[in-house]
């Protein structure tokens, strides 16, 4: 299913950008060093919240993709559960609709 693969790739790229940019949101008095896009252990709430949200979003969308692939492997093509899972995936892409890589077919 190329449409699922393209959407997963698009979301993965956006989340990778967010993970990289999370390091920009440390508080001014943060003693922790920032190393190559990774957030060190510190008490700044914003980077940790961004990284936690991205990890949760990845997990949910990965579960949706696995459901679609599993049903496709069993010969079910776009069952109700697959359609619902794909709608969830498209909802996660909606905040990025202004990105040049956005495809209108991803609108929920």
Positions of PLM-derived features:
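Amphipathic alpha-helical oligomerization segments
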Residues: 17-24, 45-80
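Aromatic-glycine hotspot motif
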Residues: 1-35, 54, 58
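Flexible loop/turn and low-complexity linker elements, especially glycine-anchored beta turns
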Residues: 2-10, 41-62, 85-108
